Amino acid sequence: MASWPPLELQSSNQSQLFPQNATACDNAPEAWDLLHRVLPTFIISICSFGLLGNLFVLLVFLLPRRRLNVAEIYLANLAASDLVFVLGLPFWAENIWNQFNWPFGALLCRVINGIIKANLFISIFLVVAISQDRYCVLVHPMASRRRQRRRQARVTCVLIWVVGGLLSIPTFLLRSIQAVPDLNITACILLLPHEAWHFARIVELNILAFLLPLAAIIFFNYHILASLRGREEVSRTRCGGSKDSKTTALILTLVVAFLVCWAPYHFFAFLEFLFQVQAVRGCFWEDFIDLGLQLANFLAFTNSSLNPVIYVFVGRLFRTKVWELYKQCTPKSLAPISSSHRKEIFQLFWRN
């Protein structure tokens, strides 16, 4: 689209070589220069916070020797997905520092982008599964048995990882490195074999990975909020509220954060599709979509490092688990000893 490097750093991996006859628009060089300077540092910051934060979350969930409840199973899988995702971000930071000249070879071009694409699906499907579980607990409590729900949660998580991996296969197959003589770089790009792939990709990206899950999330959380309002009088009589209410508050916050981070990305991805099929034209739209995709993409990336912060500041039960883990890992204080016994120990210690 633009005369800048034909690489849109998106988890949808929709970057392509521009057509030979594409109009070269260069109306925002200062903005691109700023992005090239700022984005690598921003990516590394996301990677650092996301790596430490999600490792911390996994340790809190997995170190105590006890069975995870259903919500914790889903949240642990979400943290694992975010952890795998942020491990690929340093490659993109180096790619931007290198003026979009991909230095890591064709295999890593495919693997890193495949991981990013899989994370997009795994994350949104896990958010749907979490919302559905809260819906069953609060709206249909009699129909949900804890043991059965735990088994279903494990199976659901396995299926989500498998489906996310399968949906990333086209990215793994179609991503490659290719020389771009006009820019004097070798870019990691997505090569779509036919124009029909543009439509198939936008259906996969905007409908399967966002609109359908969004409809499910809205349905489940609408009924969750209605159920919580119906229990408001009961919860007032309980000190601090029920355990289910605390867990639900955490999950609702995670859902809102996910939608805020990812909605702009899908909006600009749809605009990019409209530009590809020439439904919108002109240098204004080209620059607007190019820059918007870059910014929206990295707003989406922040979600992977934001979730651990939400656990700490919103998840009261999570903070309780952190404190319990701290006490478990901290050596217990020694029993007090008499002064005479202490004197005897010192004499034995200093004896030559």
UniProtKB/Swiss-Prot annotation:
Localization, per the record, is: Cell membrane
Q: Mind listing the GO biological process terms from this record?
A: G protein-coupled receptor signaling pathway; inflammatory response; response to mechanical stimulus
Q: Which PROSITE patterns match?
A: G_PROTEIN_RECEP_F1_2
Q: List the GO cellular component terms.
A: plasma membrane
Q: Which residues are tagged as glycosylated in the record? A: N13, N21, N184
Q: What is its main location?
A: membrane
Disulfide-bonded cysteine pairs: these are: C109-C188
Cytoplasmic topological segments = 63-72, 132-153, 228-250, 316-352
Q: Name one GO molecular function term.
A: bradykinin receptor activity
S-palmitoyl cysteine lipid sites = C329
The answer to whether UniProt assigns keyword DNA-binding to this entry is no
What membrane topology term does the record carry?
Multi-pass membrane protein
The record ties this protein, via Gene3D superfamilies, to: Rhodopsin 7-helix transmembrane proteins
> Which residues are exposed on the Extracellular face of the membrane?
1-41, 94-110, 175-206, 272-294
**Entry keyword set:** Cell membrane, Disulfide bond, G-protein coupled receptor, Glycoprotein, Lipoprotein, Membrane, Palmitate, Receptor, Transducer, Transmembrane, Transmembrane helix
Give TM regions: 42-62, 73-93, 111-131, 154-174, 207-227, 251-271, 295-315
Question: What is this protein for, i.e. what is its function?
Answer: This is a receptor for bradykinin. Could be a factor in chronic pain and inflammation.
Q: Which family does it belong to?
A: Belongs to the G-protein coupled receptor 1 family. Bradykinin receptor subfamily. BDKRB1 sub-subfamily.
Q: Which named protein is this? A: B1 bradykinin receptor
